[in-house]
């Protein structure tokens, strides 16, 4: 649950100050992944010192605190220039060990900083490895699993059979001992100007920038088997044989820069040319040449890694005129929902085509059951669309929380189609559920917002929601785009159902009008801010609804609790008499979502029960709903759309309310405590 960033300049002169600025800016782009501590490792010597040395600077708190700490280092000359240099940086969200400078990354192999490493993920067998290393005399400073990796590579180096063992060989041996998930980047005094990076289960990509022509667009994958017995004869020989055709470099050994990161948002301002590493890839840069190798070959392996061109633009990841990324992303929803539909929904012919699914559509139509799996907000998007998916596909639809799905060892069959929803495409529980379903022969479909993510690569087919980068930890625009993506899937499945044509056309007309209706809802921000002024001192809040808007209540309550730290509960109105009614009194704030849909009369019954107990309901209702407003303490009137899409409009006031509540309570909206954007650990 961390952010990795590293920068290598080869034959590109950079001052230490410029290197610091590049590393810090990269971390700031990744701060949404974790922000309880941060650190960097750079070359510490100032040319007049012959002995190589790595300088570590680590600080508890956000990246800004680290930035301030860097300029307090009297021992480092910020003006000294490096023609070739490799620096690594890390922003952390604690999984092992409390937030502190000693537990932050980079972690070191020893007090001499011979090897340093940054890590995103969890090593599940670190206790066994630590016990072994302690028995060999290695002393530990931190409580982290990552320090075990740093000590382990030092152990492998100390026990090397040959003096000229390569850096990548050391890393290869280390990862063969690791269990769990990791993305790792290593730096060492023994290999100046070299970098090694590897991943298994956690995302990692490499950006490349050069004003000169690059040697290749396809980096061939090299294979070898390194064992204690044959390392001298095989590994050493093969690495020496590497020629320029097996590596990526600037033609003529010219200047080139490499950027390593957990996420493309940290790289895009430097370059849009990237290589996505796959599980168990080992990428090594030496003398300005990037090579990629793997220990074992399998039939499904691609023979190379292609350089891909990212379409993301820098301004997409900046706040603009908004005070927080979350606020910006709420107001981007007219554009993001349009982008989700663009090129997919033909409003003239009333047809829908999801290009990522078209080759598998016949197989999907033959399935017996749909299983939709997600966590948090992604799960709520599945709940929100379950009813319309059942209606349009005429199939049973199971909606599952990924962790519970795995805990139950849920039966999955070859004629099931399983959807995996994740904004980042890296959510650990969802990824494990994907692998569980693949092992049982089900067809797997990814619904993600991140090209090249683990879920998008490992599923059989998928839908890119195309919502644009979402930086705020609390998901907003990704939710509405996930919602629409699933509705579009239902529309595509029902295209040949004559009995459903009127319903399909109604929904497609509703999709067409959504961007303008969302703008209308966003114009209510001032009214919602006034409501927040009344509520921000409260300690608890109930959000109640049913039918299509039950998911709205769950999602709204989640937004409120995760960024305002108020207790908030989404309640199915049909369950009111089975317990929650006991909470209702004149002090308890209650938000009710009551729309003109098939559940309207039943919601009126719930409203009567709330007011009979002296409740003072705040009602989200349709503009023409005079009946509900008679019993409301306050109303927020929303434009009306087709019932199955109403949840997109009704969730936005709750997103805005949670934002303003958090601001009024004095909390950091984009970085709520104890949470991170991309949940890459179980």
From Swiss-Prot:
GO biological process terms on file: cellular response to leukemia inhibitory factor; energy reserve metabolic process; fructose 6-phosphate metabolic process; protein N-linked glycosylation; UDP-N-acetylglucosamine biosynthetic process; UDP-N-acetylglucosamine metabolic process
Catalytic activity: D-fructose 6-phosphate + L-glutamine = D-glucosamine 6-phosphate + L-glutamate
Pathway(s) per entry: Nucleotide-sugar biosynthesis; UDP-N-acetyl-alpha-D-glucosamine biosynthesis; alpha-D-glucosamine 6-phosphate from D-fructose 6-phosphate: step 1/1
The EC number(s) this enzyme carries: 2.6.1.16
Keyword Phosphoprotein: yes
Amino acids binding substrate: 377-378, 422-424, 427, 578
Superkingdom of the source species: Eukaryota
Residue stretches making up the Glutamine amidotransferase type-2 domain: 2-288
Domain SIS: 360-499, 531-672
Residue spans crossing the bilayer: none
Tissue: Highest levels of expression in heart, placenta, and spinal cord.
Alphabetized CDD domains for the sequence: GFAT, SIS_GlmS_GlmD_1, SIS_GlmS_GlmD_2
Keyword Transferase carried by entry: yes
Gene Ontology CC: cytosol
Role: Controls the flux of glucose into the hexosamine pathway. Most likely involved in regulating the availability of precursors for N- and O-linked glycosylation of proteins.
Protein name in UniProt: Glutamine--fructose-6-phosphate aminotransferase [isomerizing] 2
């Amino acid at each position: 649950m961390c952010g990795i960033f590293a920068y290598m300049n080869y034959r590109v002169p950079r001052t230490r100050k410029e290197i610091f600025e590049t590393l810090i800016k990269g971390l700031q782009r990744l701060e949404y992944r974790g922000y309880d501590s941060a650190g960097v490792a750079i070359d510490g010597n100032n040319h007049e010192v012959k002995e190589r040395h790595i300088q570590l600077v680590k600080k508890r708190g956000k990246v800004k605190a680290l930035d301030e700490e860097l300029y307090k280092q009297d021992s480092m000359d910020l003006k000294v220039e490096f023609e070739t240099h490799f620096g690594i940086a890390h922003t952390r969200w604690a999984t092992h060990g409390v937030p502190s400078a000693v537990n932050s990354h980079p972690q070191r192999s020893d007090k001499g900083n011979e090897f340093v490493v940054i890590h995103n993920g969890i090593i599940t067998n670190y206790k066994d490895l630590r016990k072994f290393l302690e028995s060999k005399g290695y002393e530990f400073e931190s409580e982290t699993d990552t320090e075990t990796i740093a000590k382990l590579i030092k152990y492998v180096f100390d026990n090397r059979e040959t003096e000229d063992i390569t850096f990548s060989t050391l890393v290869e041996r280390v990862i063969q001992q690791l269990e769990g998930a990791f993305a790792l980047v290593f730096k060492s005094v023994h290999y100046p100007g070299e970098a090694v990076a590897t991943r298994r289960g956690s995302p990692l990509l490499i950006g490349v920038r050069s004003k000169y022509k690059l040697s290749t667009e396809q980096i061939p994958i090299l294979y070898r088997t390194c064992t204690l017995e044959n390392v001298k004869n095989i590994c050493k020989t093969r690495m020496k044989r590497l020629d320029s055709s097996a590596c990526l470099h600037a033609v003529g050994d010219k200047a080139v820069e490499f950027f390593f990161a957990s996420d493309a948002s940290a790289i895009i301002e430097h370059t849009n040319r990237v290589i996505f590493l796959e599980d168990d890839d080992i990428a090594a840069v030496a003398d300005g040449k990037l090579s990629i190798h793997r220990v074992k070959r399998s039939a499904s392996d691609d023979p190379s890694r292609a350089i891909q061109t990212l379409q993301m633009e820098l301004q997409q990841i900046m706040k603009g005129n908004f005070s927080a990324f979350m606020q910006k992303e709420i107001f981007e929803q007219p554009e993001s929902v349009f982008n989700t539909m663009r090129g997919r929904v033909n409003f003239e012919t009333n047809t829908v085509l999801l290009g990522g699914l078209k080759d598998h559509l016949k197989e999907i139509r033959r399935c017996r059951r749909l299983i939709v799996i997600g966590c948090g907000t992604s799960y709520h998007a599945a709940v929100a669309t379950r009813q319309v998916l059942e209606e349009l596909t005429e199939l049973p639809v199971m909606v599952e929380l990924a962790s519970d799905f795995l805990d139950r060892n849920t039966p999955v069959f070859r004629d099931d189609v399983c959807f995996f929803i994740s904004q980042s495409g890296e959510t650990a529980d969802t990824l494990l559920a994907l692998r569980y379903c693949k092992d049982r022969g089900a067809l797997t479909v990814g619904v993600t917002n991140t090209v090249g993510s683990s879920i998008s690569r490992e599923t059989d087919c998928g839908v890119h929601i195309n919502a644009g980068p979402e930086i705020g930890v609390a998901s907003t625009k990704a939710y509405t785009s996930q919602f629409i993506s699933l509705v579009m899937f239902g529309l595509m499945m029902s295209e040949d159902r004559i009995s459903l044509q009127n319903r399909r056309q109604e929904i497609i007309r509703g999709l067409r009008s959504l961007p303008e209706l969302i703008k209308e809802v966003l114009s209510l921000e001032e009214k919602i801010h006034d409501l927040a002024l009344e509520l921000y001192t409260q300690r608890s809040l109930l959000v109640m609804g049913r039918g299509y808007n039950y998911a709205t209540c769950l999602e709204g309550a989640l937004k409120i609790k995760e960024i305002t730290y108020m207790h908030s509960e989404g309640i199915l109105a049909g369950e009111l008499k089975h317990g929650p009614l006991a909470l209702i009194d004149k002090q308890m704030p209650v938000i009710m979502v009551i729309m003109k849909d098939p559940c309207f009369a039943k919601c009126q019954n719930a409203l009567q029960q709330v007011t009979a107990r002296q409740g003072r309901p705040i009602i989200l209702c349709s503009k023409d709903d005079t009946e509900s407003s008679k019993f409301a303490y306050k109303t927020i009137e929303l434009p009306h759309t087709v019932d199955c899409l109403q949840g997109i409009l009704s969730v936005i006031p709750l997103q805005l309310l949670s934002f303003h509540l958090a601001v009024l309570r004095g909390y950091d909206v984009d970085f709520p405590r104890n949470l991170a954007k991309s949940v890459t650990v179980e």
